[in-house]
Amino acid sequence: MPVPGATVMTYAAAPGRACGSCTLCCKVYALPQLEKPPGVWCGHCAPGQGCKIHDALPEQCRRFNCLWMTDGKMPDEWRPDRAKFVLSLYPENGFVYGQVDPGSPAAWRRAPYFDGLRAMAKALIAERRHVLMFLGDDATLIMPDQALSLGKMTTRDNFRIEQVFGPQGPTWRAARI
């Protein structure tokens, strides 16, 4: 499993990677330019086939950086249409954000994904970066030892984490600020 902290932010597909029949980003993200809310298929998407206006994509679509596409070491089972969530590196803070298909809200909690997300979180925390999974605007912070619900959030909201020590050893707490 690759470590996102070692991944160079790029919008270019890794060698051998292509969207193919994957169109999940066309469902899970809001597209304000097209007045498309999150969680519903874009009217220009042919699910499982691709975009019908690919030559005239909105800027948000052209600039999107699907982590599976840009990280050639990420296993094939992490391709968004298989995993049922889309991971990306948020350019402003380097966090890994996942947007979950509302038709499969617990997909990221299944094997091998939850353990992989926790491994990413462990690698990123030393860099003060984090992994957040979103179902719509409900955010869950993935920590090395657990998943912490943060409630409704946007990419502009902030949170604070702290390590605490208990009878089972160190763990984490998070709070919105």
Roles of regions detected by a PLM:
Residues 1-177:
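Short loop/turn segments that flank or connect secondary-structure elements
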